[in-house]
Amino acid sequence: MAKYLGPKLKLSRREGTDLFLKSGIRAIDSKCKLDQPPGQHNMRKSRFSDYGIQLREKQKVRRIYGILERQFSNYYKRAARIKGNTGENLLKLLESRLDNTVYRMGFGATRAEARQLVSHKSIMVENRIVNIASYQVVPNTVIKIHKKSHKQSRIRASLELSEQQREKLAWIEVDPIKLQGLFKRYPERSELSANIDEHLIIELYSK
């Protein structure tokens, strides 16, 4: 499946919830009618089958984290091989991606912006440049902005906005002065969005 390059808000409307693809830290403006799917107005909403509901949930989570279909399927397979709850394992793998961790630390206003910082070699993991967005971060890992990127205004702006509006995360510690953060541990399920029903995704792949 090819990467989607169309309007970001259209995807949020399709899923009926803010996917934080464009707005990042701030919620989508109330003018964007998330309860109305994209397309012709005043059309009756179609009812989804169980399979359709499961598929929509998978698409929603895949779009939140900006992952292609094959990648997402591989994450599920990895999660299923790990001891414990497969759904929670899946979310932990997604949350510990480098691009997502950079976003969670507030260095990027959106996951797409964080991914760009990674690909442009602006991110260092344990004092080593890593430009692979899917790199898996492990507990007690220090992530910092490369010195050459310290003057990027978008990083400072994102950090300022993050401090003002984003909820503090217990599994991440950030030093905005040094432009670095610590991934202390994997997040617990209770600390992640309740707007995600990973059980539907597991049911979909278990068929």
UniProtKB/Swiss-Prot annotation:
One cellular-component annotation, GO: small ribosomal subunit
Protein origin, superkingdom: Bacteria
Any one of the GO BP annotations: ribosomal small subunit biogenesis
PROSITE patterns attached to this UniProt entry: RIBOSOMAL_S4, S4
Keyword Translocase set for record: no
NCBIfam families in UniProt: PRK05327.1, rpsD_bact
Family: Belongs to the universal ribosomal protein uS4 family.
Function: One of the primary rRNA binding proteins, it binds directly to 16S rRNA where it nucleates assembly of the body of the 30S subunit.
Record's protein name: Small ribosomal subunit protein uS4
Source organism (scientific name): Blochmanniella pennsylvanica (strain BPEN)
Lineage: Bacteria, Pseudomonadati, Pseudomonadota, Gammaproteobacteria, Enterobacterales
